[in-house]
Structures are given as structure tokens and as C-alpha cells.
């Protein structure tokens, strides 16, 4: 290591060493590595299905593409494998166009849409009926946001459980 490294370079090298990451990112190699990881997981567990909620953001688009590639790889080997993408809106989502654009890129084997609004609203109503009081509307909205996240998780786990995933 050269003594004339800038502090940023030195910090970057420390981070690279501490996290054991490659100093150069090879996108094709990382794509293959992550796809193999998902395929290996299904192979080793005997499961047949990957399930993922697609929000319309970059993270779920990327993960959805990886999941679809993994099941296609397994099918090319003669294995039974499926990717189920899920839309989990709370009523009508403002970002639905972005989610649909992402789904067009992913091209999942199956798409399932489950509106979480009835379940989320029922839980909030049950909390009110049980005597839960919130500090203000913002606090209640925060709690409702957490309820929505849990309802999405419940839906995905239920679908995975129904499809060997």
C-alpha cells in the first residue's frame, strides 16, 4: 500500500478489507452468484417455489429478476420450480404503474394480487375496539404502516406455504 493514499482511499481499503468484498464489482459474476444462491437454496431444501412481493421499487425489481432466473435455471435442469410475484397493495397504490413496468421486465411465472387493506384496517379497528389509544393521527398512521408491512409478510408466507416455497 502506498504511503501517499488519500484518507478516502485508505478508508475505502479498510472497509473493503473489513467486509471482505472485492475491490472491483463484476456484475455478471455477481448476477450468476446470486442466482446460484437462490437455486441452491431450493435444491438443498427440496422447496419448489420462490415468492416475493413486488413494490415497484428497484430492490424488488432486482430481486424479482434474480428469483425468475433461478427458477428458470432449475427448470433447465429438469426440476420443478416456480416464481410467484405478488402485488400487495393497500387499496389502490399510487405507484402501480411502476410496479407493472417492473413486472413486465421480470416476467414472473405467476402473479398474484392480494389487497391488504381489509386485513390491515380490521387489525387497526380491533386495536381501537380493544382500547388502544394513539398519541395523535401521525402516531396512528405510523402504527398502521407497521401493520401493513406485517400483513404483506403474512400474505407472502401463506402463498409460499401453499406452494412448497
Label the predicted regions:
Residues 2-165:
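ATP-dependent adenylation/nucleotidyltransferase module used to activate substrates
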Amino acid at each position: 500500500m502506498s504511503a501517499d493514499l488519500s484518507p478516502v482511499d485508505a478508508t475505502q481499503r479498510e472497509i473493503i478489507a473489513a467486509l471482505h468484498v472485492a475491490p472491483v464489482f463484476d456484475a455478471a459474476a455477481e448476477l450468476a452468484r446470486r442466482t446460484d444462491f437462490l437455486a441452491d437454496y431450493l435444491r438443498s431444501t427440496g422447496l419448489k417455489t420462490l415468492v416475493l412481493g413486488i413494490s415497484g421499487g428497484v430492490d424488488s425489481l432486482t430481486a424479482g429478476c434474480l428469483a425468475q432466473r433461478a427458477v428458470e435455471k432449475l427448470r433447465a435442469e429438469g426440476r420443478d420450480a416456480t416464481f410467484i410475484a405478488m402485488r400487495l397493495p393497500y387499496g389502490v397504490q399510487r405507484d402501480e404503474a411502476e410496479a407493472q413496468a417492473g413486472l413486465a421486465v421480470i416476467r414472473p411465472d405467476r402473479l398474484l394480487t392480494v389487497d391488504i387493506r381489509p386485513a390491515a384496517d380490521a387489525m387497526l379497528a380491533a386495536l381501537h375496539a380493544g382500547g388502544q389509544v394513539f398519541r395523535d393521527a401521525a402516531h396512528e398512521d405510523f402504527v398502521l404502516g407497521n401493520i401493513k408491512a406485517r400483513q404483506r409478510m403474512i400474505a407472502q408466507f401463506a402463498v409460499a406455504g401453499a406452494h412448497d416455497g
